[in-house]
Structures are given as C-alpha cells and as structure tokens.
C-alpha cells in the first residue's frame, strides 16, 4: 500500500484540526488503517522538517552583531520549496512604492500614485468625556474649520510661538553666550558641539561641577603611610610600577590604572595592611577596576598567573570582597583622563601636548608627594608643563576656564613633577612604557628637556598650594590589620 503524499495543508490540518474553529470536521467513517498511516506520515513529516543546521555550534565573537551567520545559509535559489512565484499584488506594489525615495511624478498613471491620507481620519478614537474641554476641542468639519479655529488664537500667543520655533535649534546655554560675548574673556568651545548628542554640551558645565565635588570625596589621605606598620612610600611606588607593567600586558584602558591606584590608596587610608598582603591588595584593586571600566575584563586566572602563583583564586576573590566592603562599594572616582580631555579641548586636541601630559599625569601614581592635589589640579599642571616643554605658548584664558585653575595655582604641582623628573629613573616599567613608539617616546623627550632647561629644585614642601586644602575630608583609619 503506497503512503499518501503529505503536503503542507495536511500537516496543518492534522496539527491544528482539533483546535482550529475554521477547520471542517473530520469524517468519522475514516478507516483506522488510514488514520494510523496518516499519523505515521505526520511523525515522518515532523522528522523531515528538522534540519541539521539547527544543531548548536560554537558562537563566533561577532555573530550577534554581524551578518556572519548568513554566510552559512543555503542560497535561496538552491532551496527546493516547490512554491510558484507569482506576480506581486497591488498591495505589495503599493507598499514598495511607499518605501521608494524618489517620489511619483505626474506622468505616472493614477493607479500607481499613492493615495494621500486624510487630515481628519474618522478612525481616530475620541477623547473620553471627562478629558475633553470645550475651549480646546478638535474640529471635525474639515480644513476650513481648522483655519477658523486658528484665527481665534490671540496675536500675542502667535508671536510667542513663532519666537520659540525660530530659536528652537539653538540651546539656551549657547544663546546666552552668543547674546553677551563682551561679558566673558574666553571662547565658548562647547557651542560647536551642541548638535552632537555624545558631547552633551547642554550639561557639560554641570557634569564637571559635580566631578569637582566628587574628586574631593574620593581623595585618599596624604599621610596614611604614617599609620602603616610594615609599609613605606617606596613600597607603594614599586607596587604601582608593577601594576603599570601588568596593565600594559593586558592592554587595558588608562582609566583602569588610575582607578586601581585610587582604590589602593583609599583602602590603605582606612585599613592597616601587612607587607605580605600588599601585592594582593594591588591585584584585587586592578581586578575591581577592570570590572568597572573594561568591556572585556581579564579573568581571575590571568591575575593569578601575573602574580606568579603567589596567590590563588580564592584569595583574590576574598580580597576583592573585603576591599569593596571597606570602601562601601563606592567606586565613583572622577578619573584624571576626564579632566585631561576637557583641557585638551582648549588646546585644540594637540596630540603631542596631550601625550606628554599623559606621561606627566601618571607621575602622580608613583610619587606620593602629589597625593594632596586633586586630579583636576594635577591634569592642569601636566598640561601647563607639557605646553611649556613643547613651546605652545602661555596659559591663556581658554585654558584657565576649561581647566579651572590660574597659573599661580599650578606652580607648586609643576615643581613636584620637575623634582621627580630630575632624579634618576626609579620606575623602569613606567619609563619604558612611554619610551615606546606608541607614546611618541615621550619619556625620552621629557628627560632630554629636563637636562637642558630645568634648574635643580629642592624640597618645597613649605610652599605647597593645594587648591582644595580646606575641603579635604577626614579619613578615620581603624587599627584593624588585614
């Protein structure tokens, strides 16, 4: 007995026959053998629809955001679907004509032209009775009634609406700056970015005011090493230099390195740490910062490998939990790179000045004498010294405005940086990092400039000018040793 050919209609009929209200009822007189054969064919039909291409495979890195998986599909012409391609219907042609960029011309037949929608559609639902008002009711008598209602609008209201329409393309912040340019001695460089939503020029002033307040709250104690029993400032520099090397090996973002060192300093400002756990604090801090800043964070096994087996995974994870509890999970640190990018706007994003300034800013990670200064002041001093080295001109009013510091407020920080650069190389990884071609050999250039132009500077601790000295918060260190 030959099996009856199973078609798509039979499959749908057998699967939906009992639940489909529009499907005709089956005849009861159908033979049991025919019923069994149709059920067997249905099972076989289900098996035939399963494709081997649905077996899960290893996902490629960009499968979810690219068309890579379309390359493995079978071409449309090679599929034997037994479907007859008919001509497009009128509704399909009309939909294609609506998607076309080129509008229909007058020479085309009337049947191909798109019908214009009516202004007042009867299918629009009306407002409820308790929400509708007589003075603002929508006219339903056509275009004439619409113009009649418009004529009743007061002239003063029309004038206000016209003024808002004319000035809606210019944000209020920049309109005020354009109206009174004589009241400021700096250029509004944010006005040209108002059309870029990524620059958020409407809120940039408020954002950096908030960051200036936040940087004071997240500053570590500049004297926390006095409470440490087994540690010294030299050990902090060695640990930071090793973290710079690990950071370069993993090719992490610069924000990750700054946040990691800030986590270390804030933790040591609150807890006493032993010498054998200092490296563990550094590894856990870099691990936390990687999770906070990076898109692809290195795994904990990578940090175990970089520690050369000194600590296992459980110790690193336990240190991570303990550090986060001590810091109360507060990782909102205003990164120095944010302030450096802001100042670079007034420098017209000069790549050489910015690269040298990045090298000078990272001195604050290694030299503990720069801890009393907030990140914004360190970045302004780094940009000031970089421009001086490259001969980019004086500290003008644009730089004063976008950095927030006058020239006299940066002299003490510049002296600290020059004092560090005049000494022999103490941190090899830091010096080699900026001696590479990637960073334009900035460390070699700075060292040559220091030898030729700088004069020996002593310890000027008594001449420090810390802009936020009166606002610094107090750190209550506990005697609990970890």
From Swiss-Prot:
Report the residue ranges that make up the Cyclin N-terminal domain in this protein: 206-332
Judging by the UniProt lineage, the source's domain of life is: Eukaryota
| InterPro entries reported for this sequence | Cyclin (IPR039361), Cyclin-like_dom (IPR013763), Cyclin-like_sf (IPR036915), Cyclin_A/B-like (IPR046965), Cyclin_C-dom (IPR004367), Cyclin_N (IPR006671), Cyclins_cyclin-box (IPR048258)
The GO terms describing molecular function are: cyclin-dependent protein serine/threonine kinase activator activity; cyclin-dependent protein serine/threonine kinase regulator activity
Query: How is this protein annotated for GO cellular component?
Result: chromatin; chromosome, telomeric repeat region; cyclin-dependent protein kinase holoenzyme complex; cytoplasm; meiotic spindle; microtubule organizing center; mitotic spindle; mitotic spindle midzone
Per the record's keyword annotation, is Nucleus included, yes or no? yes
GO BP terms: namely: cell division; G1/S transition of mitotic cell cycle; meiotic nuclear division; mitotic DNA damage checkpoint signaling; negative regulation of ascospore formation; negative regulation of meiotic cell cycle; positive regulation of G2/M transition of mitotic cell cycle; positive regulation of mitotic sister chromatid biorientation
Where in the cell? Nucleus; Cytoplasm, Cytoskeleton, Microtubule organizing center, Spindle pole body
Region Disordered, as annotated, extends over 35-140
Question: What is its quaternary makeup?
Answer: Interacts with cdc2. Interacts with rum1. Associates with microtubules. Also interacts with cdc11.
Question: What is its biological role?
Answer: Essential for the control of the cell cycle at the G2/M (mitosis) transition. Interacts with the cdc2 protein kinase to form MPF. G2/M cyclins accumulate steadily during G2 and are abruptly destroyed at mitosis. Involved in the reorganization of the cytoskeleton on transition from G2 to mitosis. Association with rum1 promotes its proteolysis during G1. Also essential for initiation of meiosis II.
User: What's the family?
Assistant: Belongs to the cyclin family. Cyclin AB subfamily.
Record protein name field? G2/mitotic-specific cyclin cdc13
Organism encoding this protein? Schizosaccharomyces pombe (strain 972 / ATCC 24843) (Fission yeast)
Gene designation = cdc13
């Amino acid at each position: 007995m030959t099996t009856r050919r199973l078609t798509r209609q039979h499959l749908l009929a057998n699967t939906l026959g009992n639940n489909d209200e529009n499907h005709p009822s089956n005849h009861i007189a159908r033979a049991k053998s025919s019923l069994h054969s149709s059920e067997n064919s249905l099972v076989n039909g289900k098996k035939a629809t399963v494709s081997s291409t649905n077996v899960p495979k290893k996902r490629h890195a960009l499968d979810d955001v690219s068309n890579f998986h379309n390359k493995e599909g079978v071409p449309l012409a090679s599929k034997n679907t037994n479907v007859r391609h008919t001509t497009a219907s009128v509704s399909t042609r009309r939909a294609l004509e609506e998607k076309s960029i080129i509008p229909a011309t007058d020479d085309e037949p009337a049947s191909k032209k798109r019908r214009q929608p009516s202004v007042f559609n009867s299918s629009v639902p009306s407002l409820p009775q308790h929400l509708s008002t007589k003075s603002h009711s929508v006219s339903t008598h056509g275009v004439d009634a619409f113009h009649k209602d418009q004529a009743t609008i007061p002239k003063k209201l029309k004038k206000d609406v016209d003024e808002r329409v004319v000035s809606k393309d210019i944000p209020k912040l920049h309109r005020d700056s354009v109206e009174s340019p004589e009241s400021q001695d700096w250029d509004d460089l944010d006005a040209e970015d108002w059309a870029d939503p990524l620059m958020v020029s409407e809120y940039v002033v408020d954002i950096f005011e908030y960051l200036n307040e936040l940087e004071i709250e997240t500053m570590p104690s500049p004297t926390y090493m006095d409470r440490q029993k087994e540690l010294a400032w030299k050990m902090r520099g060695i640990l930071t230099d090793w973290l710079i090397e690990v950071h370069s090996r993993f090719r992490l973002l610069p924000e990750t390195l700054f946040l990691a060192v800030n986590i270390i300093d804030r933790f040591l400002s609150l807890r006493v740490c032993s010498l054998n756990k200092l490296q563990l604090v550094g590894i856990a801090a870099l691990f936390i910062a990687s999770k906070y800043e990076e898109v692809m964070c290195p795994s904990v096994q990578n940090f175990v490998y970089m520690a050369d087996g000194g600590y296992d995974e459980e110790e690193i994870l336990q240190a991570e939990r303990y550090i986060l509890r001590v810091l109360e999970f507060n990782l909102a640190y205003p990164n120095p790179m944010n302030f450096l990018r802001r100042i670079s706007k007034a420098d017209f994003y000069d790549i050489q000045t910015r690269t040298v300034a990045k090298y000078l800013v990272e001195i604050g990670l290694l030299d503990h004498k720069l801890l009393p200064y907030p990140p914004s002041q360190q970045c302004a001093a780094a940009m000031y010294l970089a421009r001086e080295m490259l001969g980019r001109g004086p500290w003008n009013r644009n730089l004063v405005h976008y950095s927030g510091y006058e020239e006299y407020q940066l002299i003490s920080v510049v002296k600290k940086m020059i004092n560090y650069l005049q000494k022999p190389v103490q941190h090899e990884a830091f010096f080699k990092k900026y001696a590479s071609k990637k960073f334009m050999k900035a460390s070699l250039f700075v060292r040559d400039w220091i030898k030729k132009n700088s004069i020996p500077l002593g310890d000027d601790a008594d001449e420090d000018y810390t802009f936020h000295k009166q606002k610094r918060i107090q750190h209550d260190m506990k005697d609990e040793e970890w």
